[in-house]
Amino acid sequence: MAKTKNEKEEFIRVGTTLYKLVNQPRLNGGYVKKRIVWNNETLRQDYGKDYLATVPKYDGFCTVPDHVDYRPVVDKFLNLYESIDHQPKEGDFPHIQSLVRHIFGEQYELGMDYLQLLYLQPVQKLPILLLVSEERNTGKSTFLNFLKAVFQNNVTFNTNEDFRSQFNSDWAGKLLIVVDEVLLNRREDSERLKNLSTTLSYKVEAKGKDRDEIAFFAKFVLCSNNEYLPVIIDIGETRYWVRKIDRLQSDDTDFLQKLKTEIPAFLYHLQHRTMATKKESRMWFAPSLLHTEALRKIIRSNRNRLEIEMHELILDIMESVGTDTFSFCYNDILLLLVHSQVKAEKHQVRKVLQECWKLTPASNGLTYTTYQFNYNRECRYEPIKRVGRFYTVTREQLESL
C-alpha cells in the first residue's frame, strides 16, 4: 500500500550504511525503536531518486550516556544511548520511598546514593547488586521493573544464557543489565561477571559482524531465590552488594503503576539530594559498607569441605582450651584432621591456608605452642611445644570468614 507524505518512514545513513527506523511492537504492548539495514535501490523505488540526498547522515555510532543533558548526536556521531522522557518535577514519592526502604532496609541511604549515581553519574562503576530471598512476593521483580521504568530502553533483561553467549551487541551499551532468576554457579560465569563489572572497555560482537571495542559502563542487578549459591563469591571479594529481601506485608496489584507516576518527583529529588557517601573505591562505596550477612552466607556456601572441616576443628580447639589464637604447622593440622576422620593432602591444606584464609607462615623456624588430641583430658586437647615455620589464626579471623 502506498504511503502518504505524512506516513513516510524515517531513514538515516551511518557511515556508508543505510538504516530504516521502525517501531517494533512488544508482546506486552508498546513499541521498541529498532534500526533495520535498508537498501539504497529500494529507497529510490519507494521515494524517488532525489530522496536519498535528504536522509540525515552521520559518521558513525557512539555511546555517551547522560540523563540530564542528553545529546542525540555527538560530533556527527549518532548516540546509541537513549534519552529518558521523564521531566523531573518537585513532589512526593511515597511509594518509591517505601520500595527503596524495603529493598535496602538499614542501608536505605546507600540505596539512595546508588540510584542517584545511576541517574547523575551513569559512567561511574558500581557494585554488582544481588537481591536474594527464598520467599515469594518479596518485591525483587518489582524493583527491577521500577528500574526499567526509570531508565527505559537503557535497561535490558538478560537470561543466564545471555552471559555465556559470545554475541553481546544487544546489551553491551546499556546502563543496567538485570537478571530476574540468576544462577551463575560456574567459576567461569563468576569470573566473567566480575570482569565485566570493572572493565572500562569491551569488545562488542554480533552475528556476521566484526568485533568492535566500546566503552563499557553497564551495572548489574541480579535477583535469585537461592540464598546460598546464586553465584560464586570468594573470600575478600569486594564487587558484590548482597541484600536479603523480606516478604512484602501486602500485595498491591497497582503498585508498579503508582511507582511510575512518582518517577518525575523522584528524579527531581535525586537532582537536589546531598549524597550520604563519598567515593572511596573504584566502585564508589567503601567495601566495608556493603559487607552484609547475606554476602557472608554465600561466601560460606562456596567453601569446600576441607575448609569447612578445618574451620570447625580449629574453632572447637579454641572453645575447648579457652584461647582466641591457634598456631600450627602442616603436620599438626593434618594429624588433627586424621583424628577427626578427615582425609587431606598437604597441598590441599596449603591452598586453604594461603589462598582462602590469606595466612602466611612465620619467616623463620621458631618455637610455638600447638594442640594435639588427648582423649584422657576433659577438654580432649593438650598443649605441646614445637619448632617450625608455623601459621597463626585468630578467632576473629575465623568468625569473619
Predicted segments, located by residue:
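Conserved catalytic/switch belt of AAA+ P-loop NTPases
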Residues: 190-212
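N-terminal nucleic-acid engagement/recognition segments and initiation subdomains in replication
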Residues: 1-106, 312-324, 335-401
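AAA+/SF3 P-loop NTPase mechanochemical coupling elements
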Residues: 167-172, 206-223
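Conserved alpha/beta core segments of nucleic-acid transaction machinery
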Residues: 272-323
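Conserved AAA+/SF3 P-loop NTPase catalytic/coupling segment centered on the Walker-B
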Residues: 176-197, 230-236
